[in-house]
Amino acid sequence: LTMIAALATGCAKAPADDGGSTNLTGSLADIVDKIYAAHPVDLSLGTENVDITDTAWMLPQFTGLTSAEGVKEAVVSEPMISSIAYSLVLVRVEDAKNAQSIAQQMKDGINPRKWVCVEADDLAVCGYGDVVMLIMVASDFAEDGITAQAMVDAFQSVCGGKLDFTL
């Protein structure tokens, strides 16, 4: 019941500090759960917090960022088997006005071949309020309905049908 309550309330919207778009409320893990409720992905996924202070490995490995400046928190959802090219990352930024700039840094810095033996050749980055989503997946999964666009659409649904940007 707790999970159902979290899913039902975890992604409410709150006014952004800058008076512009609204921000998603709830934890990033709750938002990931809502995305998967909107578009299930059957890849034995796990969702974990990203240590944004680890700028030597963890932050760039999962977000593409080399600095945590402007970042509040991040989570990554990936298969528990490391040779599957699928990664969904949510980053909450400190100021929604900087979300698109940080999203561009993520897109420019992410390594779609981080798995070495497989590559995520389908990539999208989008944002709403203070949350940026990066999704990358091997196009081999398109036949199963797992594409970057499908996950962008699911995130858009969680955001009430509107995104602030898509890169």
Question: Model-found features: residue ranges?
Answer:
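Mid-length scaffold segments of soluble, non-membrane domains
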Residues: G64-G109, R113-V116
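Intrinsically disordered, low-complexity, charge-rich terminal extensions
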Residues: K13-G26, V158, K162
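Sec-dependent N-terminal signal peptides
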Residues: L1-T2
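Extracytoplasmic/secreted envelope proteins and their assembly/folding machinery
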Residues: L28-V32, A99, A103-K107, A148-V152, ...
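A short, solvent-exposed beta-edge/loop patch
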Residues: M80, C117-L167
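Surface-exposed, low-hydrophobicity interaction/linker segments
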Residues: T22-P79
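C-terminal motif of bacterial Sec signal peptides marking the signal peptidase cleavage site
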Residues: A6-K13
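Structured segments of extracytoplasmic/periplasmic soluble domains
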Residues: K34, A38, Q105-R113, A154-K162
